[in-house]
C-alpha cells in the first residue's frame, strides 16, 4: 500500500491517490468525513479552520460503496481558494500583477521550511515553499488514515489517540483501555483527565496573548494487533522503524518513542522487560507493556503505544529575527495566519498516520487482494499465538 498527495495550502484542492487497498471493503464517505472533522477541532486553532469545511469526495476506486482493489482517489476542496484565486491560480500573470502582489514572501520564518526550501528549489518568492510545506497537507493524510481505519476495523483492530502534554502541563502517561476509550474527545484539548484541561487552555491562551506558540506530546494506541507483524531480519522491515518514520514526517514533529520510551533509560532491565505469560484461551501475552507492544521490530500482541513530540508551531505573531533574502537586511520574520497550538489536532493526524503504517505493514505481511482473504490470514495468525 502506498499513497501520493498533491496540492498547495491555498490552492484549489488537495488530492490523494491510494494504491493497494484490498477489494470488497465497505466504505462510507461519512465515516471518512467524521475523521476529517476531528482534525479541524481542538483548542488553539486559528481562523483558517473557521473557513474550511473539510469533506472528501471519492472519485475513483470505490463503486456503490465498496472498494474495487484499484487506486482510490480522494479530493478535499480548499474553500479559502476563493480569496487566493489570482495569487495561487495556475494561469500566467503579468509582471505588473506580480509586482503588485501583496503576498510575496521574502522574509523566511525561523523553524520553517522557507529559507532552505527556497535555496533548494531556487524560489525567490518563498510562498512557493510554504504553500506545500504547510500542515494543510495533513488533511489529505487524515483522509488516507481514515480509509485505513475502516480496513483495520474489519480486522477487529482498534486505534485511538489522546494528548499527553501541552506546554509542560501533563496528563498521566498511561491509562487502561477501558478508561482511555470511554473518555475519548471528552474535551477540546483531548486529554483524559478533565481536571487539567482548563490549565492547558489557560496555557494556550497565554501563548496566544503573547504572540507565541506551544507544543506538546500526543499518544496513539493500537489494540488487538496480531503477533509477528514486522521483522527482526532487516532494519527496513522493522515495524517500529516504519511507524517512527511516519510519525516524524508529520509537520512539526521532532521525536517519537514507544511504550515507556525515553524513561526506559532511567530504569534497570528488570523493570522494563515485559514478562511472558500464557493462557490457554488467548495464548502468549505479557505481564506488563513497558515496551509498547513491540519486540525485535515486531508486534508482540500487546497494545502498540506510540508517543509523538510536536514542537511549537514556527509561525509567530511576535516574530523572531530573520533576513530579507532580496536585500540581505535584518527584518522580523513573515507573519502568516496560523494556530497558537495545534497539539490536539496533531493527535488526530498522528493517529491516522499510524493507521496507515499499520495497514501497510499488515498488507506486506499478509499479501491479500481482497478483504475476505486478509481476514482469514489474520485469524490464522492469531490462532498461532495460542498453538505455538
Curated annotation (Swiss-Prot):
Native species: Staphylococcus aureus (strain NCTC 8325 / PS 47)
GO biological process, one term: amino acid biosynthetic process
Protein name in the entry: Chorismate synthase
Annotated cofactor note: Reduced FMN (FMNH(2)).
Alphabetical UniProt keywords: Amino-acid biosynthesis, Aromatic amino acid biosynthesis, FAD, Flavoprotein, FMN, Lyase, NADP
GO CC list: cytosol
Catalysed conversion reaction: 5-O-(1-carboxyvinyl)-3-phosphoshikimate = chorismate + phosphate
E.C. numbers: 4.2.3.5
Amino acid at each position: 500500500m502506498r499513497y501520493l498527495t498533491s496540492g498547495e495550502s491555498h490552492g484549489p484542492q488537495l488530492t490523494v491517490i491510494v494504491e493497494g487497498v484490498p477489494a470488497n471493503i465497505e466504505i462510507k464517505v461519512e465515516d471518512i468525513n467524521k475523521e476529517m472533522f476531528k482534525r479541524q477541532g481542538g483548542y488553539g486553532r486559528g481562523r483558517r479552520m473557521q473557513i474550511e469545511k473539510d469533506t472528501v469526495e471519492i472519485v475513483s476506486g470505490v463503486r456503490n460503496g465498496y472498494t474495487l482493489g484499484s487506486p482510490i482517489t480522494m479530493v478535499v476542496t480548499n474553500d479559502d481558494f476563493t480569496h487566493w484565486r489570482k495569487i495561487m491560480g495556475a494561469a500566467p500573470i503579468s509582471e505588473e500583477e506580480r509586482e503588485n502582489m501583496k503576498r510575496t514572501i521574502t522574509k523566511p520564518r525561523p523553524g520553517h521550511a522557507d529559507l532552505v526550501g527556497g535555496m533548494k528549489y531556487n524560489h525567490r518568492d518563498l510562498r512557493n515553499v510554504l504553500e506545500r510545506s504547510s500542515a494543510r497537507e495533513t488533511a489529505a493524510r487524515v483522509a488516507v488514515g481514515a480509509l485505513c481505519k475502516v480496513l483495520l476495523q474489519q480486522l477487529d483492530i482498534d486505534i485511538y489517540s489522546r494528548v499527553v502534554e501541552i506546554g509542560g502541563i501533563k496528563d498521566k502517561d498511561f491509562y487502561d483501555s477501558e478508561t482511555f476509550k470511554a473518555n475519548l474527545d471528552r474535551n477540546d484539548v483531548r486529554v483524559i483527565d478533565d481536571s487539567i484541561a482548563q490549565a492547558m487552555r489557560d496555557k494556550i491562551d497565554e501563548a496566544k496573548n503573547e504572540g507565541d506558540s506551544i507544543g506538546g506530546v500526543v499518544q496513539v494506541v493500537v489494540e488487538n494487533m496480531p503477533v509477528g507483524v514486522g521483522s527482526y531480519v532487516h532494519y527496513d522491515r522493522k515495524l517500529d522503524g516504519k511507524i517512527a518514520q511516519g510519525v516524524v514526517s508529520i509537520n512539526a514533529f521532532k521525536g517519537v518513542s514507544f511504550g515507556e520510551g525515553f524513561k526506559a533509560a532511567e530504569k534497570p532491565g528488570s523493570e522494563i522487560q515485559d514478562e511472558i505469560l500464557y493462557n490457554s484461551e488467548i495464548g502468549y501475552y505479557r505481564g506488563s507493556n513497558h515496551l509498547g507492544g513491540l519486540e525485535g521490530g515486531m508486534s508482540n500482541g500487546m497494545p502498540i503505544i506510540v508517543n509523538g513530540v510536536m514542537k511549537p508551531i514556527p509561525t509567530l505573531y511576535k516574530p523572531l529575527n530573520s533576513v530579507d533574502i532580496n536585500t540581505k537586511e535584518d527584518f522580523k520574520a513573515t507573519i502568516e495566519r496560523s494556530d497558537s497550538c495545534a497539539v490536539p489536532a496533531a493527535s488526530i493526524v498522528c493517529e491516522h498516520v499510524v493507521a496507515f503504517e499499520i495497514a501497510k505493514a499488515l498488507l506486506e505481511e499478509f499479501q491479500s487482494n481482497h478483504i475476505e482473504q486478509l481476514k482469514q490470514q489474520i485469524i490464522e495468525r492469531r490462532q498461532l499465538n495460542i498453538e505455538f
